[in-house]
């Protein structure tokens, strides 16, 4: 609860403050260290480390054993594997920043970052999405710096001397008269974080995502070291699986997929042609079956195998062929019904397509609406559909002769 105490018991959660510590406190985007504090019969599990008031380190965690009192002497044991993975990502972040500025322009400025053991995230100013080609070049440049195995040189110097040396400072960050400068290859930045000894220790750098955060701010995420290798291996497994499904090798996945998509488009065109022919054949029969009510031809029918588009085409064709007409067509699939209604000629103004489709849809558990001359709707398939379609001529008659 934030109150200072003189001691804690096993099972208590607390923030322990030490006069000095090997733990890194979260700062500059780099997450705080985890590990353990040990003393005589004392074991405190550190889940996070934060900087307090800019100078103290707060070790957050839980006392697993013993009684920890104010003034006790303890030793710290940092989770070395977690720190090592975090270090790779922090040094890679510096190389990434340099590659972004080198390729996209010096307007690129850091707007936020996360340096964690499992990944790195970098937010930066840029006016448009980074293209796939640009991302590939950025990744290539960073890996080139990794392979160059540059030594990472860390020095403390005066702020003006650092600026004269070309060091990049973070906008809005507060610095003292003495600053810590981290240089690796062409990258020179002010930084208080932990880093590799040489860039080659990063092993591999792999970009995994790019997107927008806000207006003028982009975000990239990346992996390094073993995490990057694991990601590449997973992508290769997926590629092999895709190749197997396509009946080819990883080298011809793109060609196989392109051929499959072209075949799908061709089949879709053939299906549309078949539907058009079916609609054309159906309309010829429906013209003969149209009912004449006060000089208006009325057609209400169910057509098998036609979707909403085919129903619209058939309705348009019937309106053209019948002149003054009221048409409502239904197509059923998987228990669902698509409805299209159309009105033309002298029926216009007296019959509204939206009202007609609403009448039919309402009887089959659905709804619909649209323009006075053309409307759409839907509902559930069942015996009620044929029954309501049979009532359409009388419904039209009541509208044409309301008295």
Q: What does each model-found stretch correspond to?
A:
Residues 1-403:
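A glycine- and charged-residue-rich anion-binding loop/surface
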């Amino acid at each position: 609860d934030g109150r200072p105490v003189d001691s804690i018991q096993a099972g208590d959660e607390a923030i322990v403050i030490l006069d000095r510590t090997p733990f890194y406190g979260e700062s500059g985007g780099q997450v705080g260290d985890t590990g353990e504090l040990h003393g005589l019969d004392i074991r405190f599990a550190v889940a996070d480390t934060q900087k307090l008031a800019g100078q103290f380190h707060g070790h957050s965690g839980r006392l697993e054993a013993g009684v920890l009192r104010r003034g006790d002497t303890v030793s710290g044991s940092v989770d070395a594997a977690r720190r090592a993975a975090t270090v790779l990502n922090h040094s890679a972040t510096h190389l990434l920043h340099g590659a972004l500025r080198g390729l996209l322009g010096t307007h690129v400025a850091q707007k936020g970052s996360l340096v964690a053991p499992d990944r790195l995230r970098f937010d930066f100013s840029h006016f448009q999405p980074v293209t796939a080609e640009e991302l590939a070049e950025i990744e290539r440049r960073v890996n080139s710096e990794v392979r160059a195995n540059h030594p990472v040189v860390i020095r403390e110097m005066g702020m003006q001397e650092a600026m004269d040396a070309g060091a990049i400072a973070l906008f809005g960050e507060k610095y003292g008269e003495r600053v810590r400068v981290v240089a690796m290859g062409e990258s020179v930045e002010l930084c208080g974080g932990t880093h590799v000894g040489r860039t080659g220790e990063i092993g591999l750098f792999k970009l995994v995502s790019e997107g927008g955060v806000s207006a003028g701010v982009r975000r990239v995420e990346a992996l390094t070291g073993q995490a990057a290798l694991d990601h590449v291996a997973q992508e290769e497994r997926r590629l092999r699986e895709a190749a197997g499904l396509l009946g080819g090798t990883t080298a011809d996945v793109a060609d196989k997929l392109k051929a499959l998509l072209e075949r799908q488009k061709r089949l879709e065109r053939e299906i549309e042609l078949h539907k058009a022919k079916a609609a054309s054949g159906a309309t010829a029969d429906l013209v003969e079956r149209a009912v004449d009510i006060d000089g208006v031809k009325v057609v209400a029918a169910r057509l098998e195998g036609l979707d909403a588009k085919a129903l619209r085409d058939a309705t348009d064709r019937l309106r053209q062929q019948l002149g003054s007409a009221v048409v409502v067509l239904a197509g059923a699939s998987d228990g669902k019904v698509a409805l299209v209604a159309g009105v033309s000629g002298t029926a216009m103004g007296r019959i509204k397509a939206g009202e007609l489709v609403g009448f039919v849809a309402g009887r089959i558990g659905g709804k619909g609406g649209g323009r006075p001359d053309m409307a759409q709707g839907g509902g559930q398939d069942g015996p009620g559909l044929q029954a309501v379609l049979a009532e359409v001529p009388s419904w039209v008659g009541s509208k044409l002769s309301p008295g």
